[in-house]
């Protein structure tokens, strides 16, 4: 288990329990207490938890591991999911993409797809996004037209949120909205950790002809703080081959296993 995977597991345990002792965390993750103490100290320095004598408590209900750390988790699954999701995009499409590790991989897959190329100076696809990192990577690609929302930048996810971000989606129509999520549950729908992110993701879904959730199996059956949309509003789920997706298929969601 890498350090970033361990950090994510520690934060998940804190989210569910509220507090952890060093000994409890070491037993849960089968690592030494010295390793856990270092992890707690480093996470406390980043204000992602509060250090206590002998352990730690959750800093806030809605925290999330920064994108730069989450990108190391389940990387191969996310790349396969992204490649399969990218195949859903036809030349000339206008798509919405939110922030996240899987959607970042999707953007990279679209950037390198051989059949998408600019003709007579016109881009092959248009991507509307609120993710600064995705816009930064794709703005140099001549076959991609990038529309970046305004808004307030979140340091954890590099996403722009707020009225300025939502306002852009009021003015556009999308063929597909690609959503990365923190949790996807048949009863509770698609969720994320931040209510402002949920708001703009919801608006993106409303403006799209089709809604595609790209999520690895660790997100299925999970829920986070803020609801994005119900399962009935999701057309396609792209996930990894090991995922148990029967409940989603029974709910009418088309599933693509990558």
For every predicted segment, state its role.
Residues 60-61, 106, 168, 186:
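Residues at secondary-structure transition points
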Residues 100-101, 217:
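Active-site metal-binding loops of divalent metal-dependent hydrolases
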Residues 2-25, 30-33, 45, 77, ...:
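Conserved phosphate- and dinucleotide-binding cores of soluble alpha/beta proteins
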Residues 2-7, 11-23, 27-99, 107-127, ...:
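HTH-adjacent hinge/linker in prokaryotic transcriptional regulators
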Residues 102-115, 188-199:
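Short Gly/Thr/Asp-enriched flexible loops that form oxyanion-binding sites at enzyme active sites
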């Amino acid at each position: 288990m890498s350090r970033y995977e361990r950090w994510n597991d520690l934060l998940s345990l804190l989210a569910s329990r509220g507090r952890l002792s060093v000994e409890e965390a070491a037993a849960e993750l089968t690592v030494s207490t010295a390793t856990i103490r270092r992890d707690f100290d480093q996470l406390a320095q980043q204000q992602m938890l509060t250090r206590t004598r002998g352990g730690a408590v959750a800093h806030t209900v809605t925290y999330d591991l920064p994108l730069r750390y989450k990108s190391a988790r389940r990387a191969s699954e996310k790349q396969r999911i992204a490649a399969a999701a990218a195949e859903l995009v036809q030349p000339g499409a206008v798509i919405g993409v939110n922030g996240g590790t899987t959607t970042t991989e999707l953007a990279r897959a679209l950037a390198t797809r051989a059949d998408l190329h600019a003709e007579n100076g016109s881009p092959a696809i248009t991507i509307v996004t609120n993710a600064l990192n995705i816009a930064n990577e794709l703005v140099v690609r001549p076959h991609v037209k990038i529309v970046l929302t305004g808004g307030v930048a979140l340091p954890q996810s590099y996403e722009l949120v707020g009225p300025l971000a939502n306002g852009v989606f009021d003015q556009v129509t999308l063929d597909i909205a690609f959503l990365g999520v923190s949790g996807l549950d048949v009863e509770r729908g698609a969720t994320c950790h931040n209510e402002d992110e949920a708001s703009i993701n919801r608006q993106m879904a409303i403006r799209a002809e089709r809604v595609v959730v790209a999520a690895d199996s660790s997100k299925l059956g999970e829920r986070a703080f803020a609801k994005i949309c119900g399962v009935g509003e999701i057309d396609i789920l792209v996930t990894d081959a090991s995922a148990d997706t029967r409940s989603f298929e029974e709910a009418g969601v088309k599933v693509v296993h990558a």
